[in-house]
Swiss-Prot record:
Disulfide pattern: none
Record domain CheB-type methylesterase: where: 199-388
The protein, known as: Protein-glutamate methylesterase/protein-glutamine glutaminase of group 2 operon
HAMAP family: CheB_chemtxs (MF_00099)
Keyword Hydrolase: yes
Domain of life: Bacteria
Protein source organism: Bradyrhizobium diazoefficiens (strain JCM 10833 / BCRC 13528 / IAM 13628 / NBRC 14792 / USDA 110)
Lineage of source species: Bacteria, Pseudomonadati, Pseudomonadota, Alphaproteobacteria, Hyphomicrobiales
């Protein structure tokens, strides 16, 4: 999985204290003004620069030295997708959030940006009039800046631990007592053994449910490459926090990665093995009984956990169909979506696997499940596929 903040900065280490420095790069003066005002109103972040083109951002990056960049895709002189690799070449740990309107072309470019090292993307309102009243855009952007920036700070703290205090003069030095060294935990990291897991269900799973958010597209594409045997024999349903158009592109990427059929779910279609069903942007995906079959039910109701689609509606609806014969996986993402649904699955006799903190872009959703004590396993992304395959093959350990 490629993320923007892997590795060390070549332009100086990121600050471990003080507000996050945010560089805003957009050719719309209205958008720049709105984002500047929103960022400036937060106590833990500040506007480092407000620039009109990608070329300005590349040329001034060393002087500005931001922690986070909000980068528009369509700009004069140098567009966002062209500026992205140049910015990361100068500052490898820069967190870059791509901003684009909801067109198919921009969605495809956003996916390309993720593969080139962007940390995340955010859909931008179609017009400046919409932007000024875009509460969702405001909320989501600030949360992405905050959570992605916090992860950068934690990684920097681990990479550069505080210097030890100077040794006292020899006369004042205490007698030496040998003790095993204990590494200091990362900021906000959980101590080993602090998380408890429960046994996997003794019931054979009949369906695989997956929920994800920030960092999810990369994680999902990596995971489904390993799940061919499961997809062939069991239904696989995925909810990824994503807007319309973006989910269309994601489904196409999942089909290519898995080499199995994958598409946005359609209201009323039967749920069968052999394909991946993805919740479409802007709709909750549930499953319902339809005679002797199981069918998709799309829900245009209010957001759940600030999200639409949300993971909890899928998880809870599946219990009425498969009872405890459910394996659910919660991947990287902000917030706690999936935790309540995961609790219900466990109460019904099913199992939950969460992605671990080290391999998550943001350890919100999987962390909430892990801290709730509902997980049978908390694993790095590169171990989840093999575990899922074993569980569906009959291994309950």
């Amino acid at each position: 999985m490629s993320v923007a903040f892997a590795g060390n900065s070549t332009s100086g280490s990121s600050r471990e204290a003080g507000p996050l420095r945010v560089m805003i790069v957009d050719d719309s003066v209205v958008i720049r003004g709105l984002i500047s005002r929103w960022v400036g109103a937060e106590h833990d972040m500040e506007v480092a620069a407000s620039l009109r083109t990608g070329l300005e951002a590349v040329n001034q990056l060393e002087r500005i030295n931001p922690d986070v960049a909000v980068l528009d895709i369509e700009m004069p002189e140098l567009d966002g997708i062209s500026a992205l690799p140049q910015l990361l070449a100068k500052k490898r740990d820069l967190v870059i959030i791509m901003a684009s309107t909801l067109t198919r072309r921009n969605a495809e470019i956003s996916f390309k940006a993720l593969s080139l090292g962007a940390a995340d993307y955010i859909p931008k309102p179609e017009s400046t009039r919409e932007a000024s009243a875009a509460d969702t855009f405001h909320h989501d952007l600030i949360q992405k800046i905050r959570h992605l920036g916090a992860r950068l700070r934690r990684k920097a703290a681990v990479a550069s631990p505080p210097l030890a205090p100077a040794s006292p003069p020899p006369a004042a030095r205490a007698p030496f007592v040998a003790r095993p060294a204990a590494p200091a935990p990362a900021a906000n990291a959980l101590l080993p053994g602090a998380l408890s897991t429960r046994p996997f269900s003794t019931l054979a799973p009949k369906v695989l449910l997956i929920g994800s958010s920030t960092g999810g597209p990369q994680a999902l594409m990596a995971l489904v490459t390993e799940l061919g045997p499961v997809i062939d024999r069991f239904p696989v349903l995925i909810t990824q926090h994503m807007p319309p158009t973006f989910t269309t592109i994601l489904a196409e990427h999942l089909a290519r990665s898995s080499r199995r059929p994958a598409a946005e779910a359609v209201d009323g279609e039967p749920v069968k093995p052999g394909r991946i069903y993805l919740a479409p942007g802007g709709k909750h995906m549930r499953v319902v009984r339809s005679g002797a079959d199981v069918a998709i039910a799309l829900d245009d109701g209010p957001a759940v956990n600030f999200c639409k689609p949300a993971v909890d509606p899928l998880f809870t609806s599946a219990i009425d169909i498969w009872h405890g014969a459910i394996l659910s996986v919660i991947l990287t993402g902000m917030g706690s979506d999936g935790m309540r649904g995961g609790k219900d699955i466990v109460a019904a006799g099913g199992s939950v696997i969460a992605q671990d903190e080290a391999s998550s872009v943001v350890w919100g959703m999987p962390g909430a499940a892990a801290n709730a004590g509902i997980c049978a396993a908390i694993l790095p992304l590169n171990q989840i596929g093999a575990k899922v395959n074993r569980l569906f093959a009959g291994d309950r350990s």
